[in-house]
């Protein structure tokens, strides 16, 4: 084996890790949880909302922690906005109904098992989107995660980070 091959396989020098390094917060993180589903309303006006909790230290987000309540149609709005205005491939949302019930108007969407399955699917959806570097700059994502009410008449565009100002 040549000397250059041996030199290329040597380990890089690294500093020893202490407890602060090992158990401190990661350098950049974005955590989004969907939890606490609540079904509200009666009859045809009945729907389920979910709490969307975000924690981050990414400088692009104005709030480091937020918790908002969203319904399925809000996730549909976000998906449509991202498909219309961004350059990212948007993953699919979980299905709208568990199964067809020909004599039931709600199609099983208020059954606990369906609500939990949808919650998991929505959590996967939002984490895939939020994990994409280009999506993190989209104003619609920031509004979805951090503002109590979604302004559906907002002006689409990019969010300027601290370094962009």
From Swiss-Prot:
Location in or out of the cell: Membrane
Cited SUPFAM superfamilies: PX domain
Domain of life: Eukaryota
GO molecular function, one term: phosphatidylinositol binding
Cysteines paired by S-S bonds: none
Keywords carried by this UniProt record: Acetylation, Lipid-binding, Membrane, Phosphoprotein, Protein transport, Transport
Transmembrane segments: none
Binding site for a 1,2-diacyl-sn-glycero-3-phospho-(1D-myo-inositol-3-phosphate): 71, 73, 96, 118
GO biological process terms, semicolon-separated: protein transport
Xref: PROSITE patterns: PX
InterPro entries according to UniProt: PX_dom, PX_dom_sf, Sorting_Nexin
An annotated GO cellular component: membrane
Predominant place of localization: membrane
Membrane topology, from the record: Peripheral membrane protein
Residues the record lists as N-acetylserine modifications: 2
Keyword flag Acetylation: yes
Protein name listed in UniProt: Sorting nexin-12
